[in-house]
Each structure stands twice: as C-alpha cells, then as structure tokens.
Amino acid sequence: MLKIYEDIINEVISRLEQVEDEVSIGKSAIHELRNEWRERLIEYTQSEWDGERMRRRDGEQGYHGYERLSEGPAHAFGGKPTTAKDPGMFEDYGSSDVSSGDSEIIGTKGSTGNCMVCLYVKVNMSKGKWKCTFKQGFISIGNIDFVFNSAQGELEW
C-alpha cells in the first residue's frame, strides 16, 4: 500500500511542478508540501506497523500478507526522511510569505486522522454546496485505506 501512496504523491508533485506558474505556487512551497506528505506517510505507516504488532501479540487477526522490511518504512523513499529539525534544510528557499499559512491549511503535525489524496476532475457550486468529481486516489479512514478510481461528493463550506 505504501507504493500506491508514494506514486500518488509523486504524481501530484510532478503535476504541480508542471503548472507552477499558472497556479502561483513556488518551488519551495511544492518541496515543503512533498516533504510534509512524506513525513506524515512515514509517521502513519510506522504507527500502523506498531498497531499491527500489538494486534498479533494479543492474538487478534491482523493483516495477512504484509511483511515488514528490516530497514523500516522510512527507507521506502530512498533514504533518510527529511524533517524540519535538519539544519539548513530550507536555507536555499529563504522565507516566503506565500507559504506562511500552510500549516493552518495542512494542519498541525501529529495525528493525521482521516485524509483523502486524489486528483479532481471538476468542482461546481450548486445551491450552496460544492459538488466534486475526483479520480485516482485513496482515502484513509481510521486505520482502513480505500483506493478508488473515481468518486463524487457534496461538500458544505
């Protein structure tokens, strides 16, 4: 399942890089977003593995067919995960007013709760509700992940 998440993150980042001038997103904001997603994915998968270990010790049925690699999930992206604690991580990008409110939009670090990552096809507003059509994504509710090819939803804002 980790490979699916990695592919979706890479696809979203590559599309953002292609249209960065049109949507007014700087390279630094894109890199910060990618790093934040990777950190959260690593934290989520580590907590999922820890929970799985506890379930198997208690004798409950867990996921079948999963094997934990000896390197751990942190190496799934090809190296040590970058964190904001690493010295000099963002010194090339400098401070930017554009991304100053990203932590409010993305949320605070810690428990990610429920999340959905996907591509959108269209968004319409009708009768005070946003009607959305999504494609190629996954939704994580609790500890259960659902992969979907297309989805529709109504949102009240």
Swiss-Prot record:
Protein family: Belongs to the TFIIA subunit 1 family.
Disulfide linkage: none
One Pfam family hit: TFIIA
Superkingdom of origin organism: Eukaryota
Protein's UniProt name: Transcription initiation factor IIA large subunit
Key word Transcription present: yes
Entry coiled-coil feature ranges: none
The keyword Transit peptide appears for this protein: no
InterPro entries: TFIIA_asu/bsu, TFIIA_b-brl
Keywords: Nucleus, Transcription
SUPFAM superfamilies reported in the protein's UniProt record: Transcription factor IIA (TFIIA), beta-barrel domain (SSF50784)
GO biological process: transcription initiation at RNA polymerase II promoter
Summary of subunit composition and partner proteins: TFIIA is a heterodimer of the large subunit and the small subunit gamma.
Subcellular location: Nucleus
Known role: TFIIA is a component of the transcription machinery of RNA polymerase II and plays an important role in transcriptional activation.
Gene Ontology cellular component annotations, sorted alphabetically: transcription factor TFIIA complex
